[in-house]
Amino acid sequence: MFNLKNRNFLTLMDFTPKEINYFLDLARDLKRAKYTGTEVQRMKGKNIALIFEKASTRTRCAFEVGAKDQGAHVTYLGPTGSHIGKKESAADTARVLGRMYDGIEYRGFGQEIVETLAEYAGVPVWNGLTDEDHPTQILADFLTIREHFNKPLSEIKFAYVGDGANNMANALMIGAVKMGMDFRIVSPKEIPTDATLVAKCKEIAAETGAKVTITDNIEEGVKGCDVLYTDVWVSMGEPDSVWESKIKLLTPYRVDMNMIKMTGNPDAKFMHCLPAFHDEETAVGKEIKEKYGLSEMEVSHELFESKYSIVFDEAENRMHTIKAVMVATLGDQ
């Protein structure tokens, strides 16, 4: 057993492999308890603030449902629902909310904001996504891999394909090296992964037995992989010029049936943190089609809907793993 009471959850860098496994074991147990109707509420009477400077489906729902299941109450502060960073500093916001709430979730921009909240709040602070990291997503990903593969995480070969400079590439690399995985980032050289973070992760890999490979060679990068993972190529709000250049660079890196076959692994799985641009059924999808002539972006519709895709198991596990983080750091032991 581990006592993680009152710990912040800002990045997986802050946790040992054993502690990460504890979160995953607890998430598995909470999932079973929910399915069997035997869940015990360990956060009765707790009040949780959810600060969302960026919109969300999965993260918000996971925190709200997870908290409700465990007997806690939540207050949602949306993009226009708080003064943080506009009329009030993150430090002042933290000291106010820390007087009223037992835990605070933050989803927004710079990692330094969630770190400031954690420094001043005096209660557990959880990172629901920043520009640099997305640790709750990684717990969901690793729980999903555990469920689909009959081997430990340390034996998993994993390739992240696409934008090697985004927060998912960072977060997956941190989690993968902690757990001793063979991890590859397959991305154009023009979109480099943060060199300082790569160096730090390689240091950790030397201790855990993990491997880190950064390559622009798709065939080499995906060979033998158990999991191919991708994320959106561009973020909402980025200028058209960025969209155009990134789409041009990343189109050869679209994950499709051919790439899954390149792994040489008939049991390979496809993962994505969602939302995914795999068809024209959204306003953004239609806009991409009109501007760039693409019916699909980072993943082909065929692969997204295929037997290889486990994206909705992964999405469900956001709730079970986020619940585990809250229970471990805030729940009655």
UniProtKB/Swiss-Prot annotation:
Pfam families: OTCace, OTCace_N. This is Ornithine carbamoyltransferase. GO terms for biological process: arginine biosynthetic process via ornithine; arginine catabolic process to ornithine; citrulline biosynthetic process. It catalyses: carbamoyl phosphate + L-ornithine = L-citrulline + phosphate + H(+). Keywords: Arginine metabolism, Cytoplasm, Transferase. GO terms for molecular function: amino acid binding; ornithine carbamoyltransferase activity. InterPro entries: Asp/Orn_carbamoyltranf_P-bd, Asp/Orn_carbamoylTrfase, Asp/Orn_carbamoylTrfase_sf, Asp_carbamoyltransf_Asp/Orn-bd, Orn/put_carbamltrans, OTCase_ArgI. Its main location: cytoplasm. Gene3D superfamilies: Aspartate/ornithine carbamoyltransferase (3.40.50.1370). It is found in: Cytoplasm. Pathway: Amino-acid degradation; L-arginine degradation via ADI pathway; carbamoyl phosphate from L-arginine: step 2/2. The keyword Nucleus does not apply. GO terms for cellular component: cytoplasm. The lineage of its organism: Bacteria, Bacillati, Bacillota, Clostridia, Eubacteriales. Reversibly catalyzes the transfer of the carbamoyl group from carbamoyl phosphate (CP) to the N(epsilon) atom of ornithine (ORN) to produce L-citrulline. Belongs to the aspartate/ornithine carbamoyltransferase superfamily. OTCase family. L-ornithine binds at N167, D231, S235, M236. NCBIfam families: orni_carb_tr, PRK04284.1.
